[in-house]
């Protein structure tokens, strides 16, 4: 008798409040999709971008030698750190600024 009672009560709820059942089904589907894609959604909201533009990839591949404008002491220091194999444009600028600030504090 218990399964019949549960089925009857479920049908009664569906009959009286179909919007509740509809909301429950939509909530279940939305929760499943969020749980499935949580990592990708987290990255999207943290970076405020949905996709990386392809122009950045083209810009990085166009550079022939990223170490072309570096001073010899900077390249020597990068070799000691093991960073002389590949650098992106932003990393190169950051390391140049860092090296300049280090050399300025050394001179003072």
UniProtKB/Swiss-Prot annotation:
Q: Which GO terms describe its cellular component?
A: membrane
Cellular location(s): Membrane
Q: Which UniProt keywords are given for this protein, alphabetically ordered?
A: Membrane, Transmembrane, Transmembrane helix
* Sequence intervals crossing the membrane: 5-25
Per the record, membrane topology reads: Single-pass membrane protein
Give the family per the record: Belongs to the nanovirus U4 protein family.
Q: What is this protein called?
A: Protein U4
The species this protein belongs to is: Milk vetch dwarf virus (isolate N)
What gene is behind this protein?
DNA-U4
């Amino acid at each position: 008798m218990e399964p019949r009672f549960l089925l009857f009560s479920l049908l009664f709820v569906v009959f009286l409040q179909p919007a509740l059942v509809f909301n429950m089904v939509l909530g279940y589907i939305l929760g499943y999709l969020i749980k499935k894609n949580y990592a990708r959604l987290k990255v999207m909201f943290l970076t405020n971008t949905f996709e990386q533009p392809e122009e950045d990839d083209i810009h990085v591949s166009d550079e022939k030698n990223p170490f072309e404008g570096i001073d010899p002491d900077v390249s020597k220091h990068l070799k000691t750190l093991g960073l002389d194999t590949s650098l992106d444009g932003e990393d190169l600028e950051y390391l140049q600024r860092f090296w300049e600030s280090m050399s300025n504090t050394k001179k003072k």
